[in-house]
Amino acid sequence: MADMFAPLVAQLKANPKTIVFTEGNDPRILEAAAKLLAEGVLKVVMVGNEAECKAAAAAGNFDISAAEIIDPENYAGFDEMVNTMVELRKGKQTPEECTALLKKSNYFGTMLVKMGKADCLLGGATYSTADTIRPALQLVKTKKGAHLVSSCFILDRDCGEEGLKRIAMGDCAVNIDYTDTIDKATGEVKIAASAKLAEVAIETAKTAKLFGIDPKVAVLSFSTKGSGKGGTVALSHDAVIKAQEMDPELAVDGELQFDAAVAPEVAQVKCKGSKVAGQANTFIFPCIEAGNIGYKIAQRLGGYAAYGPILQGLNAPINDLSRGCNADEVYKMSLITACQS
């Protein structure tokens, strides 16, 4: 196990959480759940048909006897769930529509979290990212003061004598780009694009802290301190100002090119005196293209292990798996998700 996960395991053994898996009969989920239960790290709720879950577990020789299996089709609290969802949706969906949605494991699992049956949820082994995030937005909703849900990746690499190097990158998976939200009635800017990117920076820094990173946040661009114009330069520049206003204690700077953010010798030339440049460990991208490409370059060419996407801005921890995930990735994302609780 990578060093990153040892303290997470210790933390969770001392303060056990309950996690919901929305795809309870998937072999990868079952293997990870069996390991979590055997280690006594988490309490586990599997959503699905009990007979199917147990048959799939038996086929893989996975012991999930300590897990609770809940089938939406015969759950005693289902009617209460429907009533709660109708109230949450405030006329946007009928009782019949809510009933149909709650028969689906992604909505059902999310409602278990909303109603306090579990602390967190991990899905997406067979669902799309949208099918994991949509119920979360509708039922769990965003935290007070949050304007958007975002994501980050935690990446680490064994650097030999230098030890384990750990960094954070956001947003690499959720927000395609950042535009102003306009008030339809007045035509005025309700939420500036720069405020949204600043929020991503602040939330990514908070996530970084959870996993042992003392965040030094670089808001990235192809420009350093006005060396370039156009594109998203103004967005990155203004986001730094907004982030400093929103969290004066945050160590954040930009706009910075990546070399100025990480290389002290470059920072000395391009932005001397910066408290972040040359030593950044938390990187904020101006659009999803840059973020997604950036973390995958670090993963595939830089030798970093990447964990995520870790969702940010929700009232409860809900995370999304890649449909190409393996059991080890499910296990590790389970630890990460529970530690957000």
Give the location of each predicted region.
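Anion-binding alpha/beta catalytic cores of soluble intermediary-metabolism enzymes, centered on
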Residues: 1-277, 281-341
